[in-house]
Amino acid sequence: MNKAKFLLLFLIMQVNHLNSQLAIGSIEEFFIEHNAYDRRIQIYYPFNNQVDQNTKFVIMNDAEELFLEEDTWRGKSWRIDKTFQDLAKSSENLNIVVIAVNSAKKPGKILNSTRRYADY
């Protein structure tokens, strides 16, 4: 299996693992590399609605803090997926998509160095 196919298979498995841990909805992940820094972009579809001209988009920074505790540096997250689950239980089915943007990180060291200041 060549490297590209292996990488694609690995990314699909990672996204499926992430989606299985969400309370509701699904996430697509993309990685952007700029110079020596990487940034993960997560597109969260809480209600899996069709994206159309009525869809509202919310852009949130610090995506590593939004969904799963294992992604955070301190072991706690906002779990916004659970908030959307509560909305679904109260019959709120919003046509919304969350664009979650991670802080820029420089990989390849024992600890990835962040460039949070670059976000501001």
Describe the residue ranges of each PLM region.
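Bacterial Sec-dependent N-terminal signal peptides
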Residues: 1-24
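Flexible, glycine- and charge-enriched loops at secondary-structure boundaries
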Residues: 6, 34-37, 73-77
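A domain-start/cap signature at the N-terminus of enzymes
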Residues: 18-57
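Extracytoplasmic/secreted envelope proteins and their assembly/folding machinery
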Residues: 41, 58, 81-85
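Short, flexible loop/turn elements at secondary-structure junctions
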Residues: 47, 63-65, 105
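Beta-sheet entry/capping signal
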Residues: 56-58, 97-98
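Structural cue for short, hydrophobic secondary-structure segments
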Residues: 60-63, 100
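Active-site machinery of serine-nucleophile hydrolases
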Residues: 67-120
